[in-house]
Amino acid sequence: CWFVQLSSIRLFEVDGNYTKIYFEDQRPMIPRTLNYLEKRLDPKTFFRANRQQIINLKWVERIEPWFSGSIKIYMKGGHEVDVSRRQTQRFKELMSF
């Protein structure tokens, strides 16, 4: 059992019927969907990048253009997240690009 501050969570990622939580060097799984989590997380801090991942915007290290108008986000700690084209537009609006 973990009690984790939301600020230390880098990302949530689908893993079968579970969601994997990335923080520090831990990756526990919880029996919740990303849709369930997305409704409960602060949208100013957490962003649904694609069908498989929700990222913590405070852990974003850099952003690069990617294929077909989408973007790739490089997270502190080494994770790379491909943002879907649809979510790329939302991300640009959110970040005021």
Annotate each PLM feature:
Residues 1-82:
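Conserved binding/recognition cores within well-folded domains
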Residues 75, 85-97:
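Eukaryotic intrinsically disordered, low-complexity regulatory linkers and tails enriched in Ser/Thr/Pro
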